[in-house]
């Protein structure tokens, strides 16, 4: 009888102990792209924005250049210099408090040297609270055309000011520099211990290096250098665009996954999107756009065995740069919150996937896809993030 009583008491104690244990909250890596053009200490920005405040010039002069235009957005924090560590300290706190734990820095290299890098090197890396935020690089290796300079952005021309294509020697220079300067930072984002590096324009990458075979050889070299630096490997991502990744007939190969065959041959490990505008018509209602995005995630999941990390964009309207632009309608904070929930559910439904979600963006003001507070929705988008990834279990 005593033994039975002891067993019963033990079971009761176990049940009470189990009941008192808090439910472990799922952990997500919510990564917001950060566009580094809002800096005041980079002289290479002045040819595009001569006033010396970076692309804030485009934001603040919109009505002056186009009186009565519907686009009249204003930053609640003002036209801050994001290359100032004091400014970045406040932005890191705001981002982290609202559920963002990774910044993906748009990173540029033109004419043999970095471009728009001071937001990262002078701002983020010198911020006293940088340990609250991880970061990684998305190499924005697209060509630079007229679009940044509003004095010429509406002209019917396609002038390539700088090309994003680079050869093998330049690629090696970039990789070695990034390994030493960024990958070795304690805050650099890693998956399974491997530094993550994303390439935006796969076509430019291939063409600059001389072809698919040469690009693959360059990636193998890059991986060796990363391992020599003490890491277990490299997590190389590519930016997914539309459904067609054909390059010089490569997709005609005899395989049931031709697009994956291309990116695997080069050596990529995973992908995400940068913007809904890259694969969905933008002149539409936001909920319908999100439906199409989720359908695209499912298509990618079917067509690729490589991991895909779901992406949510806040909106799209490029009119500050080009005056007339397709624009997303009804992209309210409430609808954005619903989109975030779908991304979270998609990650939950793929338990083998690293829980990474990318968001466009922290500060793409001139594309009207930003989390930072403004005169229209205030802190609405940030509060939506907080409800989904901080407040809820």
For each feature predicted by the language model, list its residue ranges.
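Glycan-processing catalytic domains of CAZymes
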Residues: 21-393
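Positively charged n-region of N-terminal signal peptides that target proteins for export
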Residues: 1-4
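Sec/Tat signal peptide C-region and signal peptidase I cleavage site
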Residues: 16-20
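Bacterial N-terminal signal peptides
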Residues: 6-15
């Amino acid at each position: 009888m005593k033994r039975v009583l002891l067993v019963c008491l033990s079971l009761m104690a176990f049940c009470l102990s189990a009941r008192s244990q808090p439910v472990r909250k799922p952990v997500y890596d919510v990564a917001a792209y950060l566009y580094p053009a809002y800096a005041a200490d980079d002289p290479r920005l002045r040819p595009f924005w001569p006033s010396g405040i970076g692309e804030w010039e485009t934001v603040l002069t919109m009505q002056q250049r186009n009186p009565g235009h519907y686009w009249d957005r204003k930053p609640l924090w003002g036209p801050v210099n994001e290359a100032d560590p004091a400014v970045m300290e406040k932005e890191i706190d705001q981002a982290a408090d609202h559920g963002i734990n990774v910044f993906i820095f748009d990173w540029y290299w033109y004419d043999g040297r970095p471009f728009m890098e001071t937001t990262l090197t002078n701002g983020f890396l010198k911020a006293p609270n940088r340990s609250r935020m991880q970061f990684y690089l998305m190499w924005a290796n697209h060509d630079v055309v007229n679009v940044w300079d509003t004095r010429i952005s509406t002209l019917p021309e396609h002038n390539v000011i700088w090309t994003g294509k680079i050869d093998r020697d330049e690629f090696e220079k970039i990789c070695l520099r990034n390994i030493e300067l960024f990958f070795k930072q304690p805050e650099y984002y890693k998956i399974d211990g491997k530094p993550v590096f994303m390439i935006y324009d796969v076509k430019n990458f291939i063409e600059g290096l001389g072809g698919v075979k040469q690009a693959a050889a360059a990636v193998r070299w890059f991986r060796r250098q990363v391992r020599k630096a003490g890491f277990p490997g490299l997590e190389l991502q590519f930016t997914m665009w539309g459904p067609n990744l054909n390059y010089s007939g490569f997709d005609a190969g005899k395989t049931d996954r031709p697009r994956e065959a291309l990116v695997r041959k080069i050596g990529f490990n995973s992908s995400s999107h940068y913007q809904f505008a890259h694969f969905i018509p933008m002149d539409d209602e936001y909920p319908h756009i999100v439906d199409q995005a989720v359908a695209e995630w499912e298509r990618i999941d079917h067509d690729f065995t490589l991991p895909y990390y779901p992406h949510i964009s806040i909106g799209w309207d490029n009119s500050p740069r080009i005056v007339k632009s397709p624009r997303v309608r009804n992209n309210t904070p409430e609808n954005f919150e619903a989109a975030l929930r779908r991304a979270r559910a998609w990650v939950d439904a793929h338990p083998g996937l690293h829980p990474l979600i990318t968001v466009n963006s922290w500060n793409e003001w001139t594309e009207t896809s930003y989390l930072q507070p403004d005169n229209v929705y205030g802190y609405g988008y940030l509060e939506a993030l907080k409800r989904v990834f901080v407040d809820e279990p």
